[in-house]
């Protein structure tokens, strides 16, 4: 099987590299990845997949399926292709998180596995999931039941230096505080004003005080998006936004309400009116299916990849977390550089263009496909994955 997978990977490599490179050269922000999603869909159609696009109301989402006439498990590979603002040429978007390569890896894994399902039975599904960096299409997909007919979902993210097994991520929710005060001349009639900027500053102060009583896994970080227009005018309208994160979604719910109270208290203290809203979708924590995680590691070893590291400790938040509560899921990492380069940088984006990165991309796609093959052909493996997932619920 190793030889077959390696041979297929060689056959499709030029197309997969071209896909990754084209998206690198034409970076698109979340929900406007029109060319990127088009390129994904066209390549999958070329290799016999039936593609639905747009998908679930998202213009840049898609679902590509290769179905056997025989029954069997349904294996999903999730693809991302959104860029980050400010990391490209002339301050435009750029692929500082390597999603050009991430998406190509999932497409490659789907194509490789599709070569076997006519014999084994089952489905191969490649899901195009826009806007991971912001709105997180996987959240909407999970809410709409997209993953409920799938037996396993995989996605592998580029990183530096080492391979890492799938680990944890932080649950995350968002909140925007919009304060309404009353303008006045800041020197001649300050007593006539109600200072919306004071409310914003007090919100930050309240949250900073809250940090003393939060758990070690809690993270709260925010920005001021509107802070007034002139120094001699008391600001009448100011806005701030926060990400609120925690290790588990149950604690996040409690922490989020505490942050809400910080904003309410600031409004009360300053006399401002307050409107609140989430400005992005909430992400659940990632509940890695360890049986599937071990299977991926085993599959990579079968292809000659040793030294896969335990999960890292630098937790962010991923929309795959929402998937992990409705379908057995893993989110491991593969290296695209031999030196430590931070993500969300121009240097990391450039690393996706190296031969080393492209070798690891194809290697990883093969491992994902081989893990899928084991599920398709080994009922006991699928049973163990399902058993662990049911215990999560």
Kindly give the residue locations of the regions a language model identified.
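Acidic/His- and Gly-rich active-site-bordering loop/insert found
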Residues: 2-96, 100-121
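Sec/Tat-exported extracytoplasmic proteins
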Residues: 20, 27, 145, 211, ...
């Amino acid at each position: 099987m190793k030889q077959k997978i390696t041979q297929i990977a060689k056959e499709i490599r030029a197309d997969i590299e071209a896909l990754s490179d084209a998206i690198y050269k034409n970076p698109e922000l979340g929900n406007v990845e029109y060319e990127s999603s088009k390129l994904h869909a066209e390549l999958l159609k070329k290799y016999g997949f039936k593609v639905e696009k747009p998908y679930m109301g998202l213009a840049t989402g898609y679902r590509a399926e290769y179905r056997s006439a025989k029954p069997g498990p349904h294996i999903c590979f999730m693809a991302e292709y959104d860029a980050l603002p400010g990391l490209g040429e002339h301050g435009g978007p750029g692929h500082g998180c390597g999603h050009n390569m991430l998406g190509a890896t999932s497409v490659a894994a789907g194509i490789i596995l599709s070569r076997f399902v006519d014999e084994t039975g089952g489905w191969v599904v490649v899901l195009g999931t826009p806007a991971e960096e912001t709105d997180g299409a996987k959240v909407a997909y999970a809410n709409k039941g997209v993953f409920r007919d799938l037996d396993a979902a995989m996605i592998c993210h580029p990183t530096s230096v080492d391979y890492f097994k799938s680990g944890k991520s932080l649950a995350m929710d968002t909140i925007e505080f919009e304060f309404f005060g009353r303008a006045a001349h800041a020197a001649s009639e300050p007593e006539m004003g109600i200072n919306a900027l004071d409310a914003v500053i007090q919100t930050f102060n309240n949250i900073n005080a809250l940090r003393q009583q939060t758990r070690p896994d809690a993270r709260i970080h925010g920005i001021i998006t509107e802070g007034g227009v002139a120094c001699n005018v008391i600001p009448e309208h100011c806005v701030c936004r926060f990400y609120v994160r925690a290790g588990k979604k149950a604690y996040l719910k409690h922490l989020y309400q505490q942050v809400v109270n910080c904003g309410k208290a600031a409004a009360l203290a300053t006399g401002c009116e307050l409107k609140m809203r989430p400005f992005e979708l909430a992400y659940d924590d990632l509940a890695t299916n360890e049986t599937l995680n071990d299977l991926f590691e085993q599959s990579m070893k079968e292809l000659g990849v040793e030294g896969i590291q335990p999960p890292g400790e630098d937790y962010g938040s991923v929309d795959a977390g929402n998937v992990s509560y409705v379908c057995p899921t893993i989110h491991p990492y593969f290296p695209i550089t031999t030196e430590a380069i931070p993500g969300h940088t121009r240097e990391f984006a450039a690393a996706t263009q190296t031969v080393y990165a492209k070798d690891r991309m194809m290697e990883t796609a093969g491992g994902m496909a081989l893990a899928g093959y084991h599920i398709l052909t080994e009922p006991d493996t699928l049973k163990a994955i399902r058993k662990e997932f049911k215990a999560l619920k």
